[in-house]
């Protein structure tokens, strides 16, 4: 069911992009929009992992200098039948983690120093199982495409507004319509953001479920989320960006976004995630 929901949201996002491109430049605008999206998606496919790891100054580690962490990842990948990903530690005291990479064969998982300090081994395993579930279901690629399309829609909408104000658009009479301009300049980018956030939230629930069944202990991840949420409500990660916030296991901006409408959250509420994990715990126990 989650796959169909995500597919529907991705199609909706693409339709918003087509609508904006078509209004701005007609058939030519649609073609340009598709070419832009294709170019950005290709770039993201091959380089987004390197860019995000560099942004957070992630340091590669192996079994020699991070034996415990390496052992946990190795054990989980064997259980999940996944290739061993590259492992990184981020020099950051705020506890958090993310996965990146275009597919399971080119994946990386990164955790902050703060996470390794405040979580016990079981909780760390729960977090890493969550991240490996993202890898297993190609969530990184899905999230990257959604983020790029949403950004492209905002950019094209801004061009439309500038072009109309400057009177340079050949379809100036049509574009001058204030209602249509409001839709292009405000409503369309807003709709794109809402859809992007919905995709992100759906994938978080799916990764939580994957972690629960991979470890067999949903309570490990639930306990980790409780600690991470408590810490993130008091501190914000250095270099945190809105573009990559959806990648982390908890929002790196913490309480700064807690009062926003649910439509604009990159993650489901932690209380909802924990409640679902508790339900899964009972489900797993009944199946034993």
UniProtKB/Swiss-Prot annotation:
Its cofactor is Zn(2+). Pfam families: Peptidase_M48 (PF01435). Coiled coil: none annotated. Its main location: membrane. The keyword Transferase does not apply. The active site is at residue 131. It is a multi-pass membrane protein. NCBIfam families: PRK03001.1 (NF002826). This is Protease HtpX homolog. It comes from Campylobacter concisus (strain 13826).
